[in-house]
From Swiss-Prot:
Keywords tagged on the record: 4Fe-4S, Cell inner membrane, Cell membrane, Iron, Iron-sulfur, Membrane, Metal-binding, NAD, Quinone, Translocase, Transport, Ubiquinone
Quaternary data: NDH-1 is composed of 14 different subunits. Subunits NuoB, C, D, E, F, and G constitute the peripheral sector of the complex.
Catalyzed reaction equations: a quinone + NADH + 5 H(+)(in) = a quinol + NAD(+) + 4 H(+)(out)
Organism: Albidiferax ferrireducens (strain ATCC BAA-621 / DSM 15236 / T118) (Rhodoferax ferrireducens)
Lineage: Bacteria, Pseudomonadati, Pseudomonadota, Betaproteobacteria, Burkholderiales
Family designation: Belongs to the complex I 20 kDa subunit family.
Record protein name field: NADH-quinone oxidoreductase subunit B
């Protein structure tokens, strides 16, 4: 991130590096717990796993205050329009973590008529966390992967 340190005490770096560093340490998640994966998401927020180490300390109740949504559980056809509405109300840049087999591809209920076979059919997903249910460690690993993805993005378009 730091490209050079001058003798006068200045640090030179790019705008993208500074902005992406700030974004990785200030993820504001919103829980969208639909099934048993939500329990593991709650475990990740407890003191044992301490999700605040990664900058995702407080789960927001309002989509307008969050920039990350963690979809944990089975997304049904009736819930899909409400989920899309919540996603549209989130602040930019929006990020989505799909947590668990049901959110990733329908899971155990894949062949049911009322289940959306993956939340990526409704919103774009950044990180998939596999498992049924995935452990709290797997969710933390997914957050770390999202942070790596944020660091690789470019804020300023290059010509």
């Amino acid at each position: 991130m730091i490209e050079g340190i001058l003798k006068e005490g200045f640090i030179t770096t790019s705008y993208d590096s500074v902005m992406n560093w700030a974004k990785t340490g200030s993820l504001w998640p919103m829980s969208f717990g639909l099934a048993c994966c939500a329990v593991e998401m709650m475990h990740a927020a407890n003191a044992r796993y301490d999700i605040s180490r990664f900058g995702a300390e407080v789960f927001r109740a309002s989509p307008r205050q969050s920039d990350l949504i963690i979809v944990a559980g089975t997304l049904c056809n009736k819930m899909a329009p409400a989920f899309r509405k919540v996603y549209d109300q989130m602040s930019e840049p929006r990020r989505v973590i799909s947590m668990g087999s049901c959110a990733n591809g329908g899971g155990y209920y894949h062949y049911s008529y009322s289940v959306v076979r993956g939340c990526d059919r409704i919103v774009p997903v950044d990180v998939y966390v596999p498992g049924c249910p995935p452990t709290a460690e797997a969710l933390l690993y997914g957050i770390i992967q999202l942070q790596h993805k944020i660091r690789r993005t470019q804020t300023i378009a290059r010509a």
